[in-house]
Amino acid sequence: MTSTKEIKNKIVSVTNTKKITKAMEMVAVSKMRKTEERMRSGRPYSDIIRKVIDHVTQGNLEYKHSYLEERKTNRIGMIIISTDRGLCGGLNTNLFKQVLFKIQNFAKVNIPCDLILFGLKSLSVFKLCGSNILAKATNLGENPKLEELINSVGIILQEYQYKRIDKIFIAYNKFHNKMSQYPTITQLLPFSKKNDQDASNNNWDYLYEPESKLILDTLFNRYIESQVYQSILENIASEHAARMIAMKTATDNSGNRIKELQLVYNKVRQANITQELNEIVSGASAVSID
């Protein structure tokens, strides 16, 4: 039978673990509020520029931009956004499962995939898988700077413009609320025309000054940058929300484990006391008989 000393040591150990997970939960709550506010403030810009792109693609363009060109898919590129740290439940695992499933589906029809990786977790997984990694960026922090992302994104855009890559996807965790975050994979290039009822019903078109090429090049590049940056903000907010839930679950489980150990401790202590009483009674009986 386990001694009371061993059980006490276990209770102390679990109690210390509970203090750590509770502290991590509180830190995650604080960081999540800040990152959620930052993420939500960026959504209007990302949505509006997406709407402008939808309107542009519905118009009659004199200049046919390469980002609008549909071509035969011989090779794809994927931007994968993960966390740098763990302890956030199945956030990264669920995303990687979907990414690997998509990559494997393309591989079945002999379409290879090049990767741009953001986050240490994606780097460790896809490096182990032997994937072709074009660029990587890690340790972006809570408030990443756009300048830190442009170089990595520019590499895959250059591959697309040189027609070495025919489609680009972006994979990240989309923040829905504090309790749910969804792994998401969307096509970044070429631009897919959405069925925008407002845009299709309008007979107007844009006038470009000084020239459509200059305007569209700038607009499309801003769009790509905004989508990647917003996806990273979504993933950071999702990370802290998932970590908050994971640490709360760990704290609750620690509390339950402490109660179980306390019950075992009381039972062992009671058994020891009963045994000692029996020994005393037996000893007293032996003395009285003598």
Swiss-Prot record:
Keywords: ATP synthesis, Cell membrane, CF(1), Hydrogen ion transport, Ion transport, Membrane, Transport. InterPro entries: ATP_synth_F1_ATPase_gsu, ATP_synth_F1_gsu, ATP_synth_F1_gsu_CS. Its main location: membrane. One of its GO terms (molecular function) is proton-transporting ATP synthase activity, rotational mechanism. The keyword Membrane applies. It is found in: Cell membrane. The keyword Translocase does not apply. It is a peripheral membrane protein. SUPFAM superfamilies: ATP synthase (F1-ATPase), gamma subunit. GO terms for biological process: proton motive force-driven plasma membrane ATP synthesis. It holds the Pfam family ATP-synt. GO terms for cellular component: plasma membrane; proton-transporting ATP synthase complex. Belongs to the ATPase gamma chain family. F-type ATPases have 2 components, CF(1) - the catalytic core - and CF(0) - the membrane proton channel. CF(1) has five subunits: alpha(3), beta(3), gamma(1), delta(1), epsilon(1). CF(0) has three main subunits: a, b and c. Produces ATP from ADP in the presence of a proton gradient across the membrane. The gamma chain is believed to be important in regulating ATPase activity and the flow of protons through the CF(0) complex. This is ATP synthase gamma chain. The lineage of its organism: Bacteria, Pseudomonadati, Pseudomonadota, Gammaproteobacteria, Enterobacterales. The gene is atpG.
